[in-house]
From Swiss-Prot:
Its main location: cytoplasm. Its EC number is 2.1.1.67. Substrate binds at F40. It holds the Pfam family TPMT. The modification N6-acetyllysine is found at K58. S-adenosyl-L-methionine binds at residues 29-40, 69, 90, 152. The lineage of its organism: Eukaryota, Metazoa, Chordata, Craniata, Vertebrata. This is Thiopurine S-methyltransferase. GO terms for cellular component: cytoplasm.
Length: 245
């Protein structure tokens, strides 16, 4: 597909009916880590986050930054190295342990008292805390509120039927003056079942528009050879910034 046409004429599907009943269990996500099917992990970090980092941080220091469905995202180390406090949640203990190992960070682990079976992993420096549990159980742990949320690979991974519940949790974690950066993918959902799931702008506005000003910072063509196996011929990533109304 001609790239110019992709950007100008790409179809926004009005809803996600075709994917709405798609469900992945937590066990299936854990199995992806075990079997190394983690194509969503970006070893060099996210290019658009790097590009718009100043817009996101606004030159502020000592921020609390939340990473939903964090995996072993290298960006967590970026923020910690800049003096910010990072909190993430991830269902895969393997993913969390790999993060600390690959970033050469020592850590402690202890049970999450409020969540049976859950664990919290903390860097020895104290500025990275990763909760190993379901995101939907996280509110029971009372993790406080955040100045920034970096949502890449989270909203697009949540089962479509859980999005409203997810958005409610995310918004409940925001402090006054928050900045929420969201990356989503645009493709033809009739050709690929997901995940990652297709999240149209109308859905984003429905989920977050009552509380947030929503601004699309950038759209980029991210189509690669691997995407042909999905049955699609284009995929566009969109970066949104949410701020307090």
């Amino acid at each position: 597909m001609d790239k110019t046409r992709t950007f100008l004429d790409v179809k926004e599907y009005p809803d996600t009916e075709v994917q709405k009943n798609r469900v992945l269990t937590l066990e299936e996500w854990q199995e992806k880590w075990v079997s190394r099917r983690i194509g969503f992990h970006q070893e060099q970090g996210h290019k658009l986050l790097k590009k718009h980092l100043d817009t996101f941080l606004k030159g502020e220091n000592g921020l609390r930054v939340f990473f939903p469905l964090c995996g072993k995202a290298v960006e967590m180390k970026w923020f910690a190295d800049r003096g910010h406090s990072v909190v993430g949640v991830e269902i895969s203990e393997l993913g969390i342990r790999e993060f600390f190992a690959e970033q050469n960070l020592s850590y402690t682990e202890e049970p999450i008292v409020e969540i049976p079976g859950g664990k919290i992993f903390k860097s020895s420096s104290g500025n990275i805390s990763l909760y190993c549990c379901s995101l939907f159980d996280l509110p029971r742990a009372n993790i406080g509120k955040f100045d920034r949320i970096w949502d890449r690979g989270a909203l697009v991974a949540i089962n479509p039927g859980d999005r409203e519940r997810y958005a409610d949790i995310m918004l409940s974690l925001t402090r006054k003056g928050f900045h929420y950066l969201l990356a989503v993918l645009c493709y033809d959902p009739t050709k690929h079942a997901g995940p990652p799931f297709y999240v149209p702008e109308a859905e984003i506005k429905k989920l977050f528009g009552s509380i947030c000003n929503i601004h699309c910072l950038e759209k980029v063509d991210v189509f690669e050879e691997q995407h042909k196996s999905w049955g699609i011929d284009y995929i566009i990533e969109k970066l949104y910034l949410f701020t307090e109304k």
